[in-house]
Amino acid sequence: MGESEKISVGIIGASGYGGVQLVRLLQEHPLVDIVYLGGKGSAGQTYAEIYPHLGHAVDLTIEPIDTEAIASRCQVVFLGLPNGLACDIAPPLIAKGCKVLDLSADYRFKNLETYSSWYNKDRSDLDTAKTAVYGLPELYREEIKSASLIGCPGCYPTASLMALSPLLKQGLILPETTIIDAKSGTSGGGRQAKTHLLLAEAEGSFGAYGVAKHRHTPEIEQISSDLAGHEVKVQFTPHLIPMVRGILSTVYATLRDPGLVREDLLTIYSAFYRSSPFVKILPNGLYPQTKWACGTNLCYLGIETDPRTDRVIVLSAIDNLIKGQAGQAVQCLNIMMGWEETLGLPQLCFYP
């Protein structure tokens, strides 16, 4: 499709944090027209009632979820629903010719048994799931171009895989030594009321959760195994930090060649991501901060080696709601439609 014709887009699950980021980004996208916002509990409310700060720009009402009506009005549909719901909605939309981008975990896995064991939901949409492409453009750009269904990655996997991928693809590390230590702001937990996300609980505190059992673990392992060419298991531990948005993922692994130095790895990473406009490789001795990525679709990577332990340390900073969610979905849309990959996506952060 050329860059002169707007496409009609719908968003199901527009009332959550991922949904409002999609609305913000797509509202300013030059080749997109938002024609439908859908939801269950919020149906009947105007979008301005839910998010008053967008009332001057978005004159739409949340509508019931009706796949027949959606397919008749939308060429592309974004699904910003809780895990386990998209797999019931995506198949009929795709059957009617819509392109679908799912922000939940439903279409991230090649093996649905893995999904079912971690997300406690049996699946009957095997044929649809087989067509899904994992929506990490820096790794699967060519596959995304011809896809009709995108399983958009989770926020932690995005940050972690951006740091880890060159090491695995080039065979530079012993994969079984991989440790991922990641920290996220509270918006990663969604907009629903949860005790541990209350200001009184989160402020001034910092702790791990989902230790040895976080659902993003098998997602990271699936892509890591794909890159390495054999099964890879990683040690992944997420932490909640008292800020609204941002992820910092620190990846540790043992180098196969202890003689590799930071300058070697900077060259390797720069070559690996040479066609990736949102990846910023930091120079010697500079390490990323989450604020640098805030509000953008950028991923900052800092690299270090420790000759004392023969380990490589890679730090990755993203905005969990943009590159880790809505922005990456829009990036995939641009690729699917044959547009400039950066179209409508911010590259300048909110600062300070």
UniProtKB/Swiss-Prot annotation:
Q: What is its EC number?
A: 1.2.1.38
Q: Which InterPro entries match?
A: AGPR_AS, AGPR_type-1, NAD(P)-bd_dom_sf, NAGSA_dehydrogenase, Semialdehyde_DH_NAD-bd
In terms of SUPFAM superfamilies, this protein maps to: Glyceraldehyde-3-phosphate dehydrogenase-like, C-terminal domain, NAD(P)-binding Rossmann-fold domains
- GO MF entries: N-acetyl-gamma-glutamyl-phosphate reductase activity; NAD binding; NADP+ binding
Keyword annotations for this protein? Amino-acid biosynthesis, Arginine biosynthesis, Cytoplasm, NADP, Oxidoreductase
What name does the UniProt record give this protein? N-acetyl-gamma-glutamyl-phosphate reductase
* Pathway given in the UniProt record: Amino-acid biosynthesis; L-arginine biosynthesis; N(2)-acetyl-L-ornithine from L-glutamate: step 3/4
PROSITE patterns membership = ARGC
Report which superkingdom the organism of origin falls in: Bacteria
Q: Which residues form the active site?
A: C155
Say where the protein is mainly found. cytoplasm
Report the record's Gene Ontology biological process terms. L-arginine biosynthetic process
Class of enzymatic activity (EC top level): oxidoreductase
Recorded source organism is Crocosphaera subtropica (strain ATCC 51142 / BH68) (Cyanothece sp. (strain ATCC 51142))
